[in-house]
Amino acid sequence: MKNVSRLLPLLPGIALLTGCNQKVQKDNGQNSQKPNIIYIFADDLGIGDLSCYGATKVSTPHIDRLAGQGVQFTNAYATSATSTPSRFGLLTGMYPWRQENTGIAPGNSELIIDTACVTMADMLKEAGYATGVVGKWHLGLGPKGGTDFNGHITPNAQSIGFDYEFVIPATVDRVPCVFVENGHVVGLDPNDPITVNYEHKVGDWPTGEENPELVKLKPSQGHNNTIINGIPRIGWMTGGKSALWKDEDIADIITNKAKSFIVSHKEEPFFLYMGTQDVHVPRVPHPRFAGKSGLGTRGDVILQLDWTIGEIMNTLDSLQLTDNTILIFTSDNGPVIDDGYQDQAFERLNGHTPMGIYRGGKYSAYEAGTRIPFIVRWPAKVKPNKQQALFSQIDIFASLAALLKQPLPEDAAPDSQEHLNTLLGKDYTSREYIVQQNLNNTLAIVKGQWKYIEPSDAPAIEYWTKMELGNDRHPQLYDLSADPSEKNNVAKQHPEVVRELSELLESVKTR
């Protein structure tokens, strides 16, 4: 029996939820007609970063092909403007701000999804799917108190519904810089144990702060701890030298692991949850992409990301799996340009606009924080088209359960709504509202033409990245139909709309 016992509210007035009270029912029916499902989370990719969304300074032909063969959304949203909470929301179907400890996770964080909760992977596994996760994880590993990377790490992704796990524990700018496969660090020498700490230095490995002469990619802010591959990271580590990744090889390794999972399960329905490291910092493209975009390393890793998507598509083609595979491509949050390294991302933009026409970006309550590229392809069932309806990533869980006619416990995926026909481009009915969350847990709500951002005493500007966070002590209201760039706060002109949306947001919090 699954239940969630540690869901504690972060914000005043937020109702305590119980999550999932019981296991989903096993589907023992025929699997032959069930579609394969691949969900690909790019990292920090903006709606303006792809040529199918209007970018003119960089070309993404593989993703463009995916969009041309599927449903391309223009009003799709991540649940949050940072990585960990967006991933939490997708897999649990619950707004991350309802639970403590769902902010940006350090590399030695405990698993933040309760193993008693029914996840989307649980649901699909019970529906007869082989389930796998490959790539960026960033939801913690191990028990409360921190991760021991030197033995079998448990709980892990296999504890919450995944049959197979090959993951980057956190982000590529955070230690430990190793891969974990089915609970074990890949290539670890037991005579060279790993120690990780996010509070103080451990061991004698050089750091960016103490040994700047050893750094090949200098930090612009924040990244001055243990140096791995000439790149200073967030956090300190020592040991595990034989297990350390090479940054320029990460995309190849993740892509090949994803392809291997597909090949291994080609005869049965499978669910692959794939998290790329691109285009997150540090941006270290493979040599075959380095210098090819004309936009510096950020542009180069966009090309690398596009190659990754092309490899997945080509694998499906070669196995004749394309027609009956639902392939969803999106980003965990909006873009950021300078996120901690002196990689000339600003200087090399050359007119490229990662945020598109939208204000803000990663970390922000403004539109570019959570309005993301979102493409769905299923050739057997879905006709190519453009989708302008409001849609949230949090609704993937309930929508896939509806597609598979898979019953859920009453309290599973409490915030996920079934919008299957919208997801598949068969109708254009919008979600009633979208809730957005920024770095500081400030919430915004979009309904119809209006967007309301609740008052907040948090900083207006993120200290390190200089990103506008959307925080203001006064209510903010924007008419997105007339002002999609959120230039004019019209809260004073429309107090009745402010009151309506404020009350709606409060009702969502306490639901």
From Swiss-Prot:
Gene3D superfamilies (UniProt xref): 3.30.1120.10, Alkaline Phosphatase, subunit A (3.40.720.10)
InterPro entries: Alkaline_phosphatase_core_sf (IPR017850), GAG_Ulvan_Degrading_Sulfatases (IPR052701), Sulfatase_CS (IPR024607), Sulfatase_N (IPR000917)
EC number(s) recorded for this UniProt protein: 3.1.6.-
Keywords: Hydrolase
Post-translational modification: The conversion to 3-oxoalanine (also known as C-formylglycine, FGly), of a serine or cysteine residue in prokaryotes and of a cysteine residue in eukaryotes, is critical for catalytic activity.
Class of enzymatic activity (EC top level): hydrolase
MF terms in GO: hydrolase activity
Alphabetical list of Pfam families matching this protein: Sulfatase (PF00884)
Keyword Secreted recorded: no
Modified residues (3-oxoalanine (Ser)): 83
Family affiliation: Belongs to the sulfatase family.
Function: Exosulfatase involved in the degradation of the glycosaminoglycans (GAGs) chondroitin sulfate (CS) and dermatan sulfate (DS). Catalyzes the hydrolysis of the 6-sulfate groups of the N-acetyl-D-galactosamine 6-sulfate units. GAG-specific sulfatases play a key role in the persistence of the major human gut symbiont B.thetaiotaomicron in the host gastrointestinal tract.
Protein name: N-acetylgalactosamine-6-O-sulfatase
Organism: Bacteroides thetaiotaomicron (strain ATCC 29148 / DSM 2079 / JCM 5827 / CCUG 10774 / NCTC 10582 / VPI-5482 / E50)
Taxonomic lineage: Bacteria, Pseudomonadati, Bacteroidota, Bacteroidia, Bacteroidales
